[in-house]
Amino acid sequence: MERRRITSAARRSYVSSGEMMVGGLAPGRRLGPGTRLSLARMPPPLPTRVDFSLAGALNAGFKETRASERAEMMELNDRFASYIEKVRFLEQQNKALAAELNQLRAKEPTKLADVYQAELRELRLRLDQLTANSARLEVERDNLAQDLATVRQKLQDETNLRLEAENNLAAYRQEADEATLARLDLERKIESLEEEIRFLRKIHEEEVRELQEQLARQQVHVELDVAKPDLTAALKEIRTQYEAMASSNMHEAEEWYRSKFADLTDAAARNAELLRQAKHEANDYRRQLQSLTCDLESLRGTNESLERQMREQEERHVREAASYQEALARLEEEGQSLKDEMARHLQEYQDLLNVKLALDIEIATYRKLLEGEENRITIPVQTFSNLQIRETSLDTKSVSEGHLKRNIVVKTVEMRDGEVIKESKQEHKDVM
């Protein structure tokens, strides 16, 4: 529209007094061969004088306008060519992006997502299995810890029993030692009593022998000297008394010895039985202690093995969980990158579509402008010979006042394939 206004202003500069009209056609009317368009349809010429000196100025102005319009058309053609090249380039990029988009769609990202989901499900399943195994191992560890605590309690109880048995055994040994000492003391006493009995018997025998010798000497002396009283009965009586006393003492000593020996024998037997029982119990406790020690060592080894296996399982579980987390993060990053790339391609495609739409609109606008300019320029060239210039008589009063009024009417007709598409009319008033 600016170019049209500039052209109209340029035309206004060389149009003389009067009216210039561009003949128009009715919309939809087709031009046949040999049809001439009248650019200015004037009223019938009045009997006046025609000034042909204005034709040269009009021709020069028209040529200048034609040159400027030709330069503008060349510039527009260059710009139009560059736009066409740009449009072709963008269309090629659009086709390439569309092909890439179709290729990406043909890859069926849903199946890829299904594959990722299947792999994620498998990884989650393995993670759940590892978690279950870890929980099971923890339960087994707790059970073994409870068993170990029970065994340790039993070991403590057995240790206490062993200590008690050892204390009892020490007491029994002390009692046995005391009984042995008492037995030895009694044996020494018995030996001393036996020696004393033997000594007393020996003394008694010597006394009896001495008495017998004395009795024999006295009897002989009595027999020799005089008849003395009978001492044999007295000696026999004394002898009988002494023998009875010795026998009684011997019997009492033997009875006392037998009773003491029986008591000591019974005490020794009891102590020996208790000692044997204590030794048997100590041996049983020792065997139980050895068995429990072996069980404890076995359980300790089993516990250490299970703890080592549990640590290995936990470390492997941590490593596998870390690898699964890394794989999951990597898959999520790949999915996110694919989504971002897809969004970027879609955004680029949308931008290219917007650019293409804008270029299509601009091309259509330029095409319409070019067609309008071509139609507008072609009509005056073809009908330049039909221009009719007339000079009207001016009012004396108006001339004397030094003012000249001009009415310029510009009628533009747009044609395509010989058909009138658009017709416009502009009227300008100028005072000189």
UniProtKB/Swiss-Prot annotation:
Phosphoserine: residues bearing it: S13, S38, S82, S323, S385
Entry keyword Cytoplasm: yes
Start and end residues of each stretch annotated as Linker 12: 215-230
One Gene Ontology term from the biological process aspect of the record: astrocyte development
Tissue-specificity statement: Expressed in cells lacking fibronectin.
Span list, region Head: 1-72
Modified residues (Phosphothreonine): T7, T110, T150, T383
Residue stretches spanning the membrane: none
Region feature Coil 1B, mapped onto this chain: 116-214
One Pfam family per UniProt: Filament
Residue ranges of the region described as Linker 2: 253-256
Chain intervals for the UniProt region annotation (Coil 1A): 73-104
Modification sites for Citrulline: R30, R36, R270, R406, R416
Subunit structure: Interacts with SYNM.
This protein's name: Glial fibrillary acidic protein
Species assigned in the record: Homo sapiens (Human)
